[in-house]
């Protein structure tokens, strides 16, 4: 590998905002927030919406995630289209 062309790859803690579960892994992601891990070291903390702990594919539970009203916005824009098409047919 060439030197000094690859991003910094370091330990990072990812936290699932839905379940609170935390994972220590390696990533190029950075954060100003830190958390003390079980080994006593501090690592950057990245908070994410979905992980394998909360994703419907892995949990088997279906749920609708509404991030900043996106579902309602979609329903307002396109929700009536299905009803309108049925009336014209």
From Swiss-Prot:
GO cellular component, one term: ribonucleoprotein complex
Keyword annotations: Ribonucleoprotein, Ribosomal protein
An annotated Gene Ontology molecular function: structural constituent of ribosome
PROSITE patterns: RIBOSOMAL_L31
SUPFAM superfamilies documented for this protein: L28p-like
GO biological process: translation
Stored InterPro entries: Ribosomal_bL28/bL31-like_sf, Ribosomal_bL31, Ribosomal_bL31_B, Ribosomal_bL31_sf
Family, similarity comment: Belongs to the bacterial ribosomal protein bL31 family. Type B subfamily.
Summary of subunit composition and partner proteins: Part of the 50S ribosomal subunit.
HAMAP family recorded: Ribosomal_bL31_2 (MF_00502)
Name of the featured protein: Large ribosomal subunit protein bL31B
Species in which this protein is naturally found: Corynebacterium urealyticum (strain ATCC 43042 / DSM 7109)
């Amino acid at each position: 590998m060439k030197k000094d062309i690859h991003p910094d790859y370091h330990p990072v803690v990812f936290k699932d905002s839905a379940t609170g579960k935390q994972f220590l892994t390696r990533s190029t992601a950075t954060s100003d927030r830190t958390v003390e891990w079980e080994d006593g070291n501090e690592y950057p903390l990245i908070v994410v919406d979905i992980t394998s702990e909360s994703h419907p594919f892995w949990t088997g539970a279906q749920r609708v995630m509404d991030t900043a009203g996106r579902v309602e916005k979609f329903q307002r824009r396109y929700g009536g289209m299905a009803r309108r098409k049925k009336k014209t047919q």
